[in-house]
Amino acid sequence: MQTYLGACTELGLADITAETVGAPQAILIEGYVWDIAEGPALARKAVDIARGNGTAIALSLSDSFCVERHRESFEEFVRDGADIVVADEDEINALLETDNFDDSLRALDDYQNLFAMTRSAKGSVIVSGAEMVVQPADGVEDVLDTTGAGDAWCAGFLYGWVNHRSLNDCARYGTHCASQVIQQLGARIEPGLLDELQSL
C-alpha cells in the first residue's frame, strides 16, 4: 500500500495543544503518524493532554507494513498509551508477531486494552478482558470498492463506544458502516448513514 500522508506531515509539536486536542470522549491516533519524523512524540503529547481531560485514546494500526516498520514503538504505545486498539487481522498478527489470528487472540491475554479487530469477509472480533464479541460481516453481493472499509468500520465502532453502547452494538455499527462503503466507489460516507446507525 502506498498511502499519501497529506497534511499530517506538516504537524509539529507546537500544533498539539490543549485547544487542538480539546476534551472529547475519545481521540483516534492513526499509526501512519509514526511515519513522520516527530510522529511518536506528537502522539505522546496528544495522549498527555487527553489523559488530563479523561479522554480515551484509540490507536489505529493503519496497515501491516506500518506495524512492521514501527513494531517496537507500537508495542510500547499499546502497553502504556492506548485504551482501544483498532486493527485488521494482518495488522494485529504483525504487532503480536504471530502467524495466524487464533494465536493472536491467545496473545491478547497479556494486554489490558480493548481490541477491535476486523477480518474482512469473516466479520470482526472485539476483545475486552474476558469478554469477546464475534460479529459476522453483512452479506453484501455487489462489492464495488473496499477503499475506506476499515476506516468506516472504525468510525461506526467508535460512534457506538462514545455513546456508551454495548460491544455487540459497537461491532454492529462498525459492520454496517463498512458494508455501506464497499457498495460505492470511494470512501466518502453518505450523510444519511448516521440516521441509519441511530435506528439500528
Can you describe what each PLM-predicted range is?
Residues 2, 95, 181:
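Residues that scaffold the ATP/ADP-binding catalytic core of kinase and kinase-like folds
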